[in-house]
Amino acid sequence: MKIAIYPGSFNPFHKGHLNILKKAILLFDKVYVVVSKNVNKSLDPDLQSRVENIKNLIKDFSNVEIIINENKLTTTIAKELNACFIIRGLRSQADFEYEIKYYDGFKSLDPNIEVVYFISDYDKRSLSSTILREIEFYKK
């Protein structure tokens, strides 16, 4: 069974994330969406509310499960779930440069883990959780 994890803060989980997840479920038997705190972001909302948001968007996906990561390394969670793959999304060359560091980090922690990158569809590339949060903030 091919098991993967799709980690992120998903604050919020948006159409770009969903686009990557839909691609991943075509290749993997089981995908765990791992919702994590982001230590680099202040005002990180409640993890449970983010999980509920994702549940509403993926209710028709039979091979996807959502879990909360309070404070574990991504590679530790992968091992606990018997996942050999970590899913990441790419929107641009800048994302690629950023992701190389993650790749190196994942491989240094677990040389057996494979990181699989999916490129966002063209119409989803401009989506960013940070931008969506800023828009929501200024709408108030």
Curated annotation (Swiss-Prot):
InterPro entries of this UniProt entry?
A: Cyt_trans-like, PPAT, Rossmann-like_a/b/a_fold
Q: Write out the residues that bind substrate.
A: 9, 41, 74, 88
Q: In chain numbering, where does the site feature Transition state stabilizer fall?
A: 17
Q: Which GO terms describe its biological process?
A: coenzyme A biosynthetic process
Locations listed in the record: Cytoplasm
Q: Which pathway does the record list?
A: Cofactor biosynthesis; coenzyme A biosynthesis; CoA from (R)-pantothenate: step 4/5
Q: Which GO terms describe its molecular function?
A: ATP binding; pantetheine-phosphate adenylyltransferase activity
Q: How does it assemble?
A: Homohexamer.
Specify the protein name. Answer: Phosphopantetheine adenylyltransferase
UniProt source species: Mycoplasma capricolum subsp. capricolum (strain California kid / ATCC 27343 / NCTC 10154)
- The organism's taxonomic lineage, starting at the top: Bacteria, Bacillati, Mycoplasmatota, Mollicutes, Mycoplasmataceae
